[in-house]
């Protein structure tokens, strides 16, 4: 990497606890669930509920789930995000490359400050959310915009999303093909995306349309017809209605209709994390097995070279 470069790429992921412990999970969830982009309930009502009820309950529960998927190097989300950044330095030798988290460490603002201290004058921000949402990408943009107001001398370009980027679509399709070549092909492929409340979509969030675009393009790259794949939304939280169809009940219904073998991929996640490894790969598989069906999870792109190359291309095209 050219350490005299005045151009940088900062990739940003959601975040993760620093350890699979109740205390670390409470700290992380406390920050995450305090973001008004994520939870829009008035703080007067939400903060007491969050700190007196939700965090004391979810902290220990989530910690036990994180422990199931924790790697020797740390949280999967953190490990794979760091590896992507390391891979990007090979594709962008004249750039500085850094990584940050929206919640937790390494903190986004601190990463921006560090780049400025290195005399960087142009920064491309790449949120690792393929499909734009006001609950994810826009939250990153909020922090970046606030930082830019006090650092006007740095030119910042923020990539909105890459839901239909040809190189990214090709990378996802190729990973599915490799899985089929190694394990055979199932009867049905599910594209499972993280859900969000239906009211958010009703207020104009384009996320469900972006998910549909991604799934359709990947299916087309695989030459699948409409009967061979299905889209679902996972990770519902709370009692209100979220985007439908819900992924797990959809799989159950398909199993009850006679389908016995499923493949599942999560194209809304750039790297594997709690939701993909514990909720989906372990959880969905167990509940389907109880219904006489099997599900094979296809990992996220993680630090796949084709993924890294696609992200490098996005960064290069982002600058005027």
UniProtKB/Swiss-Prot annotation:
The record ties this protein, via Gene3D superfamilies, to: 3.40.50.1400
Under the cellular component aspect of Gene Ontology, which terms does the record hold?
cytoplasm
Would the keyword Transferase turn up in this protein's UniProt record? no
EC primary class: lyase
Q: Organism's domain of life?
A: Bacteria
UniProt keywords, alphabetically: Cytoplasm, Heme biosynthesis, Iron, Lyase, Metal-binding, Porphyrin biosynthesis
Q: What is this protein called?
A: Ferrochelatase
Organism from which the protein derives: Xylella fastidiosa (strain Temecula1 / ATCC 700964)
